[in-house]
From Swiss-Prot:
Entry GO CC: small ribosomal subunit
Gene giving rise to this polypeptide: rpsT
Domain of life: Bacteria
Similarity comment: family membership: Belongs to the bacterial ribosomal protein bS20 family.
Coiled-coil region list: none
Upper taxonomic lineage: Bacteria, Pseudomonadati, Pseudomonadota, Alphaproteobacteria, Rhodobacterales
Gene Ontology process terms (BP): translation
Protein task: Binds directly to 16S ribosomal RNA.
Gene3D superfamilies associated with the record: Ribosomal protein S20 (1.20.58.110)
Protein name: Small ribosomal subunit protein bS20
An example Gene Ontology molecular-function term: small ribosomal subunit rRNA binding
Keyword line: Ribonucleoprotein, Ribosomal protein, RNA-binding, rRNA-binding
Pfam families to which the protein is assigned, alphabetical: Ribosomal_S20p
Amino acid sequence: MANSPQAKKRARQNEARFQINKARRSRIRTFLRRVEEAIASGDKEAATAALRAAQPELMRGVTKGVFHKNTAARKMSRLAARVKVLG
């Protein structure tokens, strides 16, 4: 339990930041799931559109510190490769 005033403030800030990051992470995962679903359905047009929508969201997550840049790059690369294979 935080005892000093600054520790109490940090605890409040950490909780607020956690909630913001949780929402941001959830939003990004939703965009990635849409790409996965489009790939699973075999619709290249929808998959490409979903990938284009997901990319800026994922990069925004990197900027905001939710994901590491290499993690985001790896996810985008793997999704792009899977979309490219679709006929």
